[in-house]
């Protein structure tokens, strides 16, 4: 049975990255530096915009985060793809948390809009994904809408984030 708490601290997320939270061969988060949040502050199978679940996570922004040194020299900004990846990570975590079996893979999204950027002067990033649909057949597929806020202002919006869980031997095509 998966670990079904509603809050996960950094050490819990690392355990997930090592494959210890949802069992061998099941959903894992990436390990640092690609783990893009410090904690999950809420996860439920109800609620959210569509009433089918929500995941909310936070990243404490520090000027020494690895990507600021290389993206870009003398013009540091968090790559937008990392914020997007964080939302995919959260959908995959939700699928494992809700009992889905298999390894997670991002499968795409419908639409993405950036209206700001995460700078090293920011204090906190909040990510939110609202689960729209979960399909469980040979493939476990989650679809969600998400947003990223920096210091309280929503600056990314993603529609139809898709993540699949694949059992050993099956691969996304």
Swiss-Prot record:
Which Gene Ontology BP annotations are present?
unsaturated fatty acid biosynthetic process
GO cellular component annotations of the record: cytoplasm
Question: Does this entry carry the keyword Cytoplasm?
Answer: yes
What InterPro entries does the record tag this protein with? FabA (IPR010083), FabA_FabZ (IPR013114), HotDog_dom_sf (IPR029069)
Which pathway does the record list? Lipid metabolism; fatty acid biosynthesis
- Cite the EC number: 4.2.1.59, 5.3.3.14
Q: Which residues form the active site?
A: 71
Q: Which CDD domains match?
A: FabA (cd01287)
* Keyword field: Cytoplasm, Fatty acid biosynthesis, Fatty acid metabolism, Isomerase, Lipid biosynthesis, Lipid metabolism, Lyase
Spell out the reaction equation it catalyses: a (3R)-hydroxyacyl-[ACP] = a (2E)-enoyl-[ACP] + H2O; (3R)-hydroxydecanoyl-[ACP] = (2E)-decenoyl-[ACP] + H2O; (2E)-decenoyl-[ACP] = (3Z)-decenoyl-[ACP]
Any one GO MF annotation of this record: (3R)-hydroxyacyl-[acyl-carrier-protein] dehydratase activity
Superkingdom as given in the UniProt entry: Bacteria
Pfam families given in the database record = FabA
Where does this one sit in the cell? Cytoplasm
Q: Which family does it belong to?
A: Belongs to the thioester dehydratase family. FabA subfamily.
Partners and quaternary state? Homodimer.
Question: What does the function comment of this entry state?
Answer: Necessary for the introduction of cis unsaturation into fatty acids. Catalyzes the dehydration of (3R)-3-hydroxydecanoyl-ACP to E-(2)-decenoyl-ACP and then its isomerization to Z-(3)-decenoyl-ACP. Can catalyze the dehydratase reaction for beta-hydroxyacyl-ACPs with saturated chain lengths up to 16:0, being most active on intermediate chain length.
Q: What is this protein called?
A: 3-hydroxydecanoyl-[acyl-carrier-protein] dehydratase
Which species is listed as the source? Bradyrhizobium sp. (strain BTAi1 / ATCC BAA-1182)
């Amino acid at each position: 049975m998966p670990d079904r708490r509603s809050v996960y601290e950094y050490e819990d997320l690392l355990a997930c990255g090592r494959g210890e939270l949802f069992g061998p061969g099941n959903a894992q988060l990436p390990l640092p530096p690609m783990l893009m949040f410090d904690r999950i502050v809420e996860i439920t199978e109800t609620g959210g915009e569509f009433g089918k679940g929500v995941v909310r996570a936070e990243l404490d922004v520090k000027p020494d985060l690895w990507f600021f040194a290389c993206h870009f020299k003398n013009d540091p900004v968090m790559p937008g793809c990392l914020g997007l990846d964080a939302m995919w990570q959260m959908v995959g975590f939700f699928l494992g948390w809700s009992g889905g079996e298999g390894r997670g893979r991002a499968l795409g999204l419908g639409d993405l809009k950036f209206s700001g950027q995460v700078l090293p002067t920011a204090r906190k990033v909040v990510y939110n994904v609202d689960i729209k649909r979960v399909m469980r057949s040979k493939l476990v597929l989650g679809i969600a809408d998400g947003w990223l806020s920096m210091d309280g202002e929503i600056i990314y919006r993603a529609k139809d984030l898709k993540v699949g869980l694949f059992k050993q031997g099956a691969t996304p095509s």
